[in-house]
């Protein structure tokens, strides 16, 4: 049985990447000997309990950077008959350099879950071309890899998996526009909640449920107070099982992000027949189909945002059409693409 080691860094335990990892590892463990390597101890560890017990979890628990480097070096130097799927650019670079220097035979495949250009975490140009192959989770990332002059045959577009769910029942007799946001609470930066709060200020009959927390929670709450929208918002805090909390169909998910990789909460929402209001970050249209499963607006354009919110209220999108709009992400199609892509890279 072939061995695969999934290399991850800086996982919090609360994000969409962890959700995808659970599904992918639990699928692949039936075909490969799987190890999950974490270069940090996640803040939240409940997600690890959802991983198949046949998956070996290898976690760095030290604190010094030198110890961490040695921990990672040992993987590439001493593991036998193992290929690597890396969610970490630094580990792609390190593994590829060791492979070349010591003439190792393993494959290093990148699998990144965020936009490659809208970030300052690593130098894409001097990192990504070293990988033997790339699993792209969105058309935007696929295009970014091509722009780095990576050969087309080294890139496979696989998207991300999402379960197929029943459509949630409609909220009874509500004339209110019920919006929700789920994710890290950030006033500015990636999640850009400032814009969301500005948007709901302009509409009277709206209520926003915010599921999540973060270092900027207090700043967001203070800004909501300053904008006079505090009474329109319920702050739920960190919610480990979002869909046990949301039992009836809200009007829409709202996202005002500056950038995303492929938003899992967006997919989870659409899969339940709930439309999406979103900023036009790169790759948003991998999921959102205008007037079919949601509405979009240009970042910074609050007038467009309020119009998108009003469209949700005035145009009753068919929840079955919403759900069916992302059929390519459902397990049967997704795992077919994943399996064939891995076979292509690992057998080459």
Task: Please annotate each region the language model reported.
Residues 290-291, 295-302, 309-316:
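Conserved acidic donor-binding segment of nucleotide-sugar-dependent glycosyltransferases
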Residues 258:
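Aromatic "clamp/platform" in nucleotide-sugar-dependent glycosyltransferases that forms part
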Residues 216-219, 230-240, 245, 295-296:
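Active-site donor-binding acidic/aromatic loop of nucleotide-activated sugar
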Residues 6-66, 216:
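N-terminal strand-loop element at the rim of the active site
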